[in-house]
Regions:
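Gly/Pro-rich hinge or "lid" segments in bacterial periplasmic/extracellular proteins
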Residues: 82, 167-219, 224, 339
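Append "and occasionally in soluble cytosolic enzymes with long acidic Gly/Pro-rich linkers
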Residues: 288-375, 379-380
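N-terminal lobe/hinge region of extracytoplasmic solute-binding protein
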Residues: 45-94, 125, 191
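Ligand-site clamp/hinge motif
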Residues: 212-257
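Aromatic- and charge-enriched surface segment that lines or borders ligand/interaction sites
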Residues: 89-130, 146, 152
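Surface-exposed binding/hinge segments that line
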Residues: 92, 96, 135-178
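A bilobed periplasmic-binding-protein/Venus flytrap-type ligand-binding module shared by bacterial periplasmic
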Residues: 210-213, 272-295, 299
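A structural "hinge/loop" feature
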Residues: 48-64, 87, 113, 157, ...
């Protein structure tokens, strides 16, 4: 029998963003979207401002969408999640705990300096020391420069996911010189080796980038990319309709329904690795009892949440990671069984149930999800 995962409720969300016709849905939107429209500026709106443009300082979506235009990594992932060469042109594994990367020659940072192995060593060691992203590189215990274009990375034990982890958007390769000179201000004036270089950041409003003519994969076809911070979803939708915006992210509810049949736009929708879930403190009673947690899992039906709150833009999950993530195991999902849930609660010492609180923030999606969960949990 397949082992069931003990998380209460998880939903794999769909990535949603809309582009005006002629754009592209590649993950480097700025490098491709709008290339066939004749425009020299692409305006992208998302629902929150970036936290930092320093890739080692935060791991949030609004920041990452901008930073992926500014920086490159040693590795990239293709559409199937398979590691592909990026700044590392090739690699070899002399043993199970060592990987040697051979770097591309002639890669320029936005300050004009050539990328060298010393920059890679500096960047990986900086990420390892950063509280926000160090967990991504857990297991790496050494980075050594062999020559200007060769780096050796060693791990404490065999690490199957190391190439995938080095492709993470936060594990960007920085210019040691530019980063050191900028100090704490690097996140507001970043220097990378990506297709776009930083121009300005009007906090709370917009980040402006321009194409880097010396990019190692060739200059991007759209000269300028502007990331707008537009908190209200309706205002993002209106901006797309009026032509003020070319791409909008974070689309939910009626706006999705309204726009997806409009032939002027392309809705790009696909599975994300993020989850919406109900969590609890397993060190405190009654949630320290596995039978209580399992009872709650059996009490929940994810379908009404997906259909009502997410308007179908999601699917029930059986794990805290999605099927497009390395290491995913296709284990059996929980399905709602009220009688079984009641029996488990009784076995745990709560034949009449117990009172509980669901804490949520002001996000309407989470609030609406909590209301449905409240109704379902009342049944046990």
């Amino acid at each position: 029998m397949k082992k069931k995962f003990g998380l209460l409720m998880t939903i794999i969300l769909s990535m949603l963003f809309l582009v005006a016709c002629g754009g592209s849905g590649d993950k480097k939107e700025g490098a491709d979207a709008g290339a066939n429209t004749g425009k020299d500026t692409l305006v992208i709106a998302q629902g929150a401002d970036a936290k930092s443009l320093d890739p080692h300082a935060s791991n949030d979506n609004p920041s990452s969408r901008i930073r992926v235009q500014i920086y490159d990594r040693l590795m990239d992932l293709d559409d199937n999640g398979v590691p592909q060469p990026m700044l590392a042109e090739s690699w070899e594994r002399p043993d199970d705990k060592t990987i040697i990367f051979h770097l591309r020659k002639g890669v320029k940072f936005h300050n004009g300096d050539e990328m060298k192995a010393s920059d890679v060593k500096f960047s990986l060691e900086r990420a390892l020391a950063a509280p926000e992203v160090s967990h991504i590189l857990t297991g790496i215990n050494g980075v050594e420069v062999l020559d200007d274009y060769t780096v050796k990375v060693t791990t404490e034990k065999p690490m199957a996911a190391i190439l995938n982890n080095l492709a993470h958007t936060t594990i960007a390769i920085l210019s040691e010189k530019a980063t050191t000179e900028a100090g704490e201000k690097f996140g507001q004036n970043p220097v990378g080796s990506g297709p776009y270089k930083f121009v300005s950041w009007q906090s709370g409003d917009r980040v402006t980038l321009e194409a880097f003519p010396e990019y190692w994969q060739g200059e991007a076809p759209v000269k300028n990319v502007v990331f707008r911070n537009i908190v209200e979803e309706t205002n993002r939708t209106i901006g797309l309709e009026t032509g003020e915006l070319d791409i909008i992210y974070d689309i939910q509810g009626m706006d999705k329904t309204k726009l997806k049949d409009d032939e002027r736009f392309v809705l790009i929708e696909g599975p994300q690795v993020s989850m919406t879930y109900l969590g609890f403190n397993m060190k405190k009673a009654p949630y320290d009892n596995p039978k209580v947690r399992e009872a709650i899992s059996y009490a929940i039906d994810q379908k009404p949440i997906i259909d009502t709150v997410f308007l179908g833009a999601g699917e029930p999950a059986n794990s805290i990671i999605g099927p497009n993530v390395w290491g995913y195991a296709d284990v059996e999902k929980y399905t709602q069984d009220i009688e079984k849930a009641k029996a488990l609660l009784a076995e745990a010492g709560f034949p009449d149930g117990f009172k509980a609180k669901i804490w949520v923030n002001d996000n309407p999606v989470r609030r609406d999800t909590a209301v449905i969960l409240q109704d379902q949990l009342k049944q046990i």
